[in-house]
Amino acid sequence: MSLGKRMGAELIGTFWLVLGGCGSAVLAASSPLGIGVLGVAFAFGLTVLTMAFAIGHISGCHLNPAVSFGLVVGGRFPAKELLPYVIAQVIGAILAAGVIYLIASGKAGFELSAGLASNGYADHSPGGYTLGAGFVSEVVMTAMFLVVIMGATDARAPAGFAPIAIGLALTLIHLISIPVTNTSVNPARSTGPALFVGGWALQQLWLFWVAPLIGAAIGGALYRGLAKEP
């Protein structure tokens, strides 16, 4: 499969992840028939699960610069293709954030300053958690996400179950950390909404690149070491 086609798949997949995950948080979480935190967590997991079946055979279904980077560290993805994948993922996330904005702004009383499901810490943490807490959360959650991804897609793992394991892992990660940072573990997912919100969301965006990338490197290296045959 050509790199261009794989980039296209990553763009579409990341678009779906942000549209489904952030879209559910913005449009469906707090309405009278709202789905709440549990629903948002499952929405993120379902986007990955569905796209893993849809495009996993095309691009690997990374949908996340941190995942791509972690797979490079883990020896599962060529470093020369990292930047093209990241570019495609970020574009997909920005397009999805734009669609969410267009829909959400069609309702009276919509305020962009509310965040468009942006990630944040301190005053912009859903639970008021500090920068330090947010950093630890994002590093650890991303590291564990990479362990699950690499383990579930290992040739020695049970065949056909990887999308389910990975989707449920992302759901669990959101259940744990939505109160802390609104859950990133994905720099592209954070970038899309932040570009529309501006202000505080852009000022705090650095954390949601730095921490997930560190966590991904830890997770990729950890699984590579654990899985190495003697």
From Swiss-Prot:
Mode of membrane association: Multi-pass membrane protein
Source organism per UniProt: Pseudomonas putida (strain ATCC 47054 / DSM 6125 / CFBP 8728 / NCIMB 11950 / KT2440)
Reactions mediated catalytically: H2O(in) = H2O(out)
Taxonomic lineage from the root: Bacteria, Pseudomonadati, Pseudomonadota, Gammaproteobacteria, Pseudomonadales
Name the UniProt record assigns to this protein: Aquaporin Z
GO annotation, cellular component aspect: plasma membrane
Motif (NPA 2): 186-188
PROSITE patterns: MIP (PS00221)
Major site of localization recorded for this protein: membrane
Site keyed Selectivity filter: positions: F44, H174, T183, R189
